[in-house]
């Protein structure tokens, strides 16, 4: 359990950083598909 408590925040931080990076890159190349007026 102690190993899980030490690795979970690291995995979560890497996951959120990767997700944010993918969204930023996608928005840079395809801005109209992500934020299109409804």
From Swiss-Prot:
UniProt keyword list: Membrane, Photosynthesis, Photosystem I, Thylakoid, Transmembrane, Transmembrane helix
InterPro entries in UniProt: PSI_PsaJ (IPR002615), PSI_PsaJ_sf (IPR036062)
GO terms under biological process: photosynthesis
Bilayer topology annotation: Single-pass membrane protein
Regions that span the bilayer: 4-24
Subcellular location: Cellular thylakoid membrane
Domain of life, per lineage: Bacteria
Gene3D superfamilies: Single helix bin (1.20.5.510)
Cellular component annotations (GO), alphabetically ordered: photosystem I; plasma membrane-derived thylakoid membrane
SUPFAM superfamilies reported in the protein's UniProt record: Subunit IX of photosystem I reaction centre, PsaJ (SSF81544)
Predominant cellular place of this UniProt entry's protein: membrane
One Pfam family here: PSI_PsaJ
Keyword Thylakoid: yes
Keyword Membrane assigned: yes
Assigned protein family: Belongs to the PsaJ family.
PANTHER family assigned: PHOTOSYSTEM I REACTION CENTER SUBUNIT IX (PTHR36082:SF2), PTHR36082
Known function: May help in the organization of the PsaE and PsaF subunits.
UniProt name for this protein: Photosystem I reaction center subunit IX
Organism the protein comes from: Synechococcus sp. (strain CC9902)
Gene: psaJ
């Amino acid at each position: 359990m102690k190993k899980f408590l030490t690795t979970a925040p690291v995995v979560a931080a890497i996951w959120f950083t990767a997700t944010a990076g993918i969204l930023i890159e996608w928005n840079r190349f395809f801005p109209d598909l992500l934020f299109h007026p409804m």
